[in-house]
From Swiss-Prot:
Listed name of the protein: tRNA dimethylallyltransferase
GO MF annotation: an example: ATP binding
Function: Catalyzes the transfer of a dimethylallyl group onto the adenine at position 37 in tRNAs that read codons beginning with uridine, leading to the formation of N6-(dimethylallyl)adenosine (i(6)A).
Pfam families cross-referenced by the UniProt entry: IPPT
Length: 320
């Protein structure tokens, strides 16, 4: 089972409802929720908000530990059969398109793998720190590529770092083209959407609530804990904006504005990514009441998985 869509659309609540109905376990497809101590800025559900449903791929790493989409794929492809063998339905819920697609299409990663969000982050790092700093960072992880790429070749420096962060492998190690295997799993592929202005209203409200709930204190704690602001995790949306505020670059009102703006831009990119996948069955979360929405989604799961899933309302039905 797959539940995707833009940030703030309500994926987590739908995932919990599906897990309750079909005796499922949730696998987070969010690239940032893997990090411990990064809770508010990643909109991570608290334990008491998870409805008693087992959630995986949350709080498994410290913020300074590297984690690529290839790492995610390796962990989740091991996790899925374990869940199935327990008689439960694996439910992949998330908005990080490349992470999700690496599972459902069983990507074999090579240097052609790409992630526009990561590339945008590297572009910002180049603007903030300069190309020489980025080139030195490349030399630390891939000295062969660094030797081949001129210190002023912005595009190639960023691309080499992008490949390394995505795949966990050096660009210089690749000698063949990217390939995508046939889908590995039988899917019930759900995507959530809503009116764009309503989504943006929810995004803006959530950003404000994050700050009111202690996001600034969370980021302060991470910095005091020794996590550098240049870490990939600390450059994520929700953290880089607060880091700028704490470093005196702007006031808190500006930080909130940037957080809201950057999250809206991210939602646009998520829409662009998921709209390319014609397998997804879209539901407008704001166009019907909750009961009708969930019944429609439950029907898709039952029809898509057929005899492999047993719908249950009262007696804890299982994935077969």
């Amino acid at each position: 089972m797959l539940i995707v869509g833009p940030t703030a659309v309500g994926k987590s609540d739908v995932g919990i409802a599906v897990a309750r109905r079909f005796n499922g376990e949730i696998i987070s497809g969010d690239s940032m929720q893997v990090y411990r101590g990064m809770d508010i800025g990643t909109a991570k559900l608290k334990q008491e908000e998870r409805g008693g449903i087992l959630h995986h791929m949350i709080d498994i790493l410290d913020p300074d530990e590297p984690f690529s989409v290839a790492d995610f794929q390796r962990r989740v492809t091991t996790l899925i059969p374990e869940i199935v063998n327990r008689g439960r339905l694996p439910i992949l819920v998330g908005g990080t398109g490349l992470y999700v697609q690496s599972i459902i299409d069983h990507y074999e990663f090579t240097e052609e793998a790409t992630d526009l969000e990561l590339r945008s982050q590297l572009e910002q790092e180049a603007d903030a720190s300069g190309l020489e700093a980025l080139h030195r960072r490349l030399a630390e992880v891939d000295p062969i590529s660094a030797a081949r790429i001129h210190v002023n070749d912005r595009k190639r420096i960023i691309r080499a770092l992008e490949v390394y962060r995505l795949t966990g492998r050096r660009q210089s190690d690749f000698h063949y083209a990217d390939s995508v295997r046939q889908p590995k799993y039988q899917l019930a592929p759900i995507a959530l959407t809503m009116d764009r202005q309503e989504l943006y209203r929810r995004i803006d409200l959530r950003a404000r609530n994050m700050i009111e709930s202690g996001l600034v204190e969370e980021v302060k704690g991470l910095l005091k804990g020794g996590y550098a602001p240049t870490l990939p995790s600390m450059q994520a949306i929700g953290y880089k904006e607060i880091v700028g505020y704490l470093q005196g670059e702007y006031d808190l009102a500006r930080a909130l504005y940037l957080l809201q703006r950057d999250t809206r831009h991210f939602a646009k990119r998520q829409y662009t990514w998921f709209r390319r996948d014609t397998r997804l069955i879209w539901f407008a979360a704001d166009a019907m009441d909750r009961e009708r929405l969930m019944e429609g989604i439950f029907d898709v799961v039952s029809n898509a998985l057929g005899g492999h899933v047993e719908r249950n309302i009262n007696d804890g039905g299982a994935f077969r």
